[in-house]
């Protein structure tokens, strides 16, 4: 059915009103009323949030989400609170949060000023930069080696913007292919349909660790931009932000955060039991003391 311009405008207006209403609501009150909290997860953001089995997300960010749930249950005195899980992508995570479908998104989301116009962010829990995953046999070692080649980038990510800008500045003439998720971009490189997969370096190390043939892949290039990751929550909800930040502050001050980091970034991770072996960055060490939610520009 083809909608008239008037009907289309009306529907868009309703959707915008619903999103505005959701943004203004008290998340804790919503959870209390519904007796349910809905957590978002990613399907292939290794080691932050990814599937170990169908419908079973695991990872560093999943454990952060679970710590928030424990505090919500405590504050609401609801030990049997229902915890619903919903997969999200880079494209739909913000709309699903602002319209009230999900209550918290902890995955591999960059905290930046542009997104801060639509959502709020908790204390930063990781820092990363854009690099490229390639096949070792390609002999690609830096960005200049990609001139005129196809690269696969997940649509809806800051990496897409960073690489487009770099491509224009350096006149690399890249053929950029947008993909639905990280796993799709990895497959394009593995099958030689793309020369590289630019993405946050930690996600590339995680995907490489769980790839079919990790030894055939490598992460190359200088980091184009260092950015923080943080959990997303709705804007204008200081009570819920205080709860989430309070949970993270407790984890960071008690040393529990560092134990979680060691588990997911230093030791072997499921399902391939390969270790990423990534020491904690200076930026993250500093933020364990600063407890900052400062965005990237």
Predicted features along the sequence, with ranges:
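Acidic, polar ligand-binding/catalytic clefts
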Residues: 66, 77-145, 286-293
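Extracytoplasmic small-molecule ligand-binding "clamshell" domains
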Residues: 24-26, 30-105
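Periplasmic-binding protein-like
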Residues: 43, 126-137, 201, 209-248, ...
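Sec/Tat signal peptide C-region and signal peptidase I cleavage site
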Residues: 17-22
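A ligand-binding cleft/hinge motif common to bilobed small-molecule-binding domains
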Residues: 92, 106-117, 161-169, 188-191, ...
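Bilobed "Venus flytrap"/periplasmic-binding protein-like clamshell domains
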Residues: 38, 43-47, 57-74, 110, ...
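Extended ligand-binding regions for polar small-molecule ligands
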Residues: 63-71, 144, 149-150, 155-157, ...
């Amino acid at each position: 059915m083809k909608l008239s311009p008037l009907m289309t405008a009306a529907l868009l207006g309703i959707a915008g009103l619903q999103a505005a209403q959701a943004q203004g609501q008290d998340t804790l009150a919503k959870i209390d009323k519904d007796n349910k909290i809905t957590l978002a997860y990613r399907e292939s953001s290794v080691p932050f949030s990814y599937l170990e089995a169908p419908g079973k997300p695991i990872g560093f960010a999943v454990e952060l989400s679970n710590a928030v749930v424990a505090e919500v249950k405590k504050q609401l005195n609801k030990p049997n609170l229902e915890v619903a899980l919903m997969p999200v992508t880079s494209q739909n995570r913000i709309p699903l949060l602002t319209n009230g479908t999900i209550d918290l998104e902890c995955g591999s989301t960059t905290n930046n000023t542009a997104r801060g116009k639509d959502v709020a962010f908790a204390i930063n829990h990781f820092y990363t930069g854009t690099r490229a995953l390639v096949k070792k046999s390609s002999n690609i070692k830096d960005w200049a080696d990609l001139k005129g080649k196809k690269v696969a980038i997940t649509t809806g990510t800051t990496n897409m913007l960073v690489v487009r800008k770099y491509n224009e500045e350096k006149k690399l003439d890249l053929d950029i292919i947008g993909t639905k998720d990280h796993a799709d971009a990895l497959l394009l490189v593995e099958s030689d349909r793309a020369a590289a997969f630019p993405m946050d370096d930690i996600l590339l190390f995680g995907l490489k660790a769980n790839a079919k043939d990790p030894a055939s892949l490598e992460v190359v290039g200088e980091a184009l931009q260092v950015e923080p990751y943080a959990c997303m929550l709705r804007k204008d909800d200081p009570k819920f932000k205080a709860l989430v930040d309070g949970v993270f502050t407790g984890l960071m001050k008690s040393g529990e955060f560092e134990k979680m980091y060691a588990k997911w970034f230093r030791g072997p991770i499921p399902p391939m039991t390969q270790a990423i072996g990534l020491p904690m960055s200076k930026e993250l060490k500093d933020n364990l003391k600063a407890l900052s939610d400062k965005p990237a520009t």
